[in-house]
Amino acid sequence: EEMNYDKGKMVMHVGGATGGKEAGIERFINNFSTYPERIKNKVILENDDKTYTASETLKICKTLNIPMVLDIHHHNCNNNGENIFEMLDEIFNTWNKEPLPPKIHFSSPREGEFDRKHADYINGEEFVKFINSAKKINRDFDVMLECKEKDIALFKLVDDIKNNYNWIDETTFEV
């Protein structure tokens, strides 16, 4: 608000599960209803790596009519066997009333497939595999990279995958 940018969003996790996940979800929904409209309009939910899966977070987002940011790494660490690509269209549809495209977070595990810590860099092969599967939805979306080496990791990823795609600029490609 102080920046006079009305499209800004706040990414949140659902939070704790004291009393069980169903109680935590109910508590989140009840608390959300007390937020001022200007805050409600800025909130987007992200699935987490320990407690609330992508499918649980999606259900909350649909109930509250708010966008969901899908975190791929969190899904890999915390899921109930759901195929993320079967959910992706539904997740992206939570953004239908927004002026901005859907967002996803992508990171690679530091050590081992289920390590919750973020690696310094992005695994280019895994990134390409995800993008090639996601393109079947035929919808623009933004990818936010979460890696310890920040911009250096972005430039390394671009170098790793540059031959796979048509590049619009140094950080934007089309599939």
Language-model regions: role of each:
Residues E1-T63, P67:
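Active-site acidic/histidine proton-transfer and metal-coordination neighborhood
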Residues V14-T18, N47-T51, I72-N76, S108-G112, ...:
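Active-site-proximal loop/turn and secondary-structure-junction residues that shape catalytic pockets
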Residues L45, L70, L145:
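Active-site flanking residues adjacent to catalytic metal/cofactor-binding acidic residues
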Residues M12-V14, I25, P36-I39, H73-H75, ...:
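A generic short-segment signal for beta-strand/edge and adjacent turn/coil regions
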Residues I66, C77-V175:
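Histidine-acidic metal/acid-base catalytic patches
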